Amino acid sequence: MKYALLSDIHSNLHALEACLAHAKAQGAERMAVLGDLVGYGAFPAEVVARCQAIQAEGGIVLRGNHEALVQTHSVNDASASLSLGGQTAQWTHDQLSPAQRFWLEILPLTACEDSMLLVHASADAPERWRYVEDERTASLSLDAATQDPAVRYVFGGHVHHQSLFYRGTGRQLMRFEPSPGVAIPTPKHRHWIATVGSVGQPRDGKPRAMYALFDSTAAKLTFQRVAYDHMAAALAVREAGLPEFFAERLETGR
């Protein structure tokens, strides 16, 4: 099965549609959205509707911290970036229908299938929204996930960067630097953990959208970058009256 792994869409409909089209062209058979559908961007209702359609078609959709933020207008996380998200929480809440807000509230935090654990943040405490950003935090997440012996792969988002770690000889965790579009063999005799990047708000200085393809049959992972009309997405943020900083982020990828 070939999975498209998409995370951190952040109400960016332009980026989401571009990634979905790209994934289908690459032969993706199942879509998995790993949380943070909303926040920051100008199209929360449209993105939620698109993700509801993905779920109805048999795809996976998980809850992220920005779904929690919309529900409560607060989140248990000390990150300064989430306080910026809080600036749009009420606006985002008001754009969504009651049915959409309820659907976001009942989304699961994790999903497990085909040797994979899917999660928005860290598998060691999914509801705490911890970042997987280095060998130490990746190891914590991987250790928790692999308490289930069926799990060989952990895929998440949250950090808005693409990264890959694997457990080598013994228990040492190794970091692998991925290149976009290059299929990486991920044999099942090892344990792997990856962050798939952000569809709707990349933060590595490049505005192209990010997602990943995982072929569970061939045991290969491919990180993808997709060009989309990020200037139109930024203009929509401005026209919605949202903070200028969010528009600039789309233009610069930071």
For the regions a language model picked out, list residue spans one by one:
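Active-site neighborhood of phospho(di)ester-bond hydrolases with catalytic His/Asp-centered motifs
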Residues: 6-7, 31-36, 40, 60-65, ...
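Active-site neighborhood of divalent metal-dependent phosphoester bond hydrolases
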Residues: 48, 54-150
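Anionic-ligand binding region
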Residues: 137-154, 159-183, 189-192
